[in-house]
């Protein structure tokens, strides 16, 4: 009886530990694109980023807490820059500063994401 109870307790603890383990999934390009889509006008025309754009930059910052997340976001940003040919490099580089957000992911076509 006690042996069966001990096995049940160990099994329950193992399941709880698996469920409590944080996800290893890195941030997706869809998440990065959604966050920064409001910034396209600023990135292509310059000026001042909109409130929605800066909110997206803050959202991107909150998504990039781990090294894997930062690398994934960096690669997504490079892919997005390749898709949108009109993006001004200087505007992209200044975006986080203009929004008052210290990003751990540089927004640049030339960044080495490793």
Curated annotation (Swiss-Prot):
Which tissues does the record link to its expression?
A: Expressed in seeds and, at very low levels, in pulp of fruit (at protein level).
Q: Which Gene3D superfamilies match?
A: Plant lipid-transfer and hydrophobic proteins
Which GO biological process categories is it annotated with? lipid transport
Q: Which cysteines are joined by disulfide bonds?
A: 29-76, 39-53, 54-99, 74-113
Q: Does the keyword Disulfide bond apply?
A: yes
Q: Which residues form the signal peptide?
A: 1-25
- Output the SMART domains linked to this UniProt entry: AAI (SM00499)
Under the heading InterPro entries, the entry gives: Bifun_inhib/LTP/seed_sf, Bifunc_inhib/LTP/seed_store, Plant_nsLTP
Keywords carried by this UniProt record: Allergen, Disulfide bond, Lipid-binding, Signal, Transport
Quick check: keyword Electron transport in the entry? no
Instruction: Report a single Gene Ontology molecular function.
Output: lipid binding
Function as written in the Swiss-Prot or TrEMBL entry? Plant non-specific lipid-transfer proteins transfer phospholipids as well as galactolipids across membranes. May play a role in wax or cutin deposition in the cell walls of expanding epidermal cells and certain secretory tissues.
**What family does the entry list?**
Belongs to the plant LTP family.
**Protein's name in the database:** Non-specific lipid-transfer protein 1
**What is the originating organism of this protein?**
Actinidia chinensis var. chinensis (Chinese soft-hair kiwi)
Lineage here is: Eukaryota, Viridiplantae, Streptophyta, Embryophyta, Tracheophyta
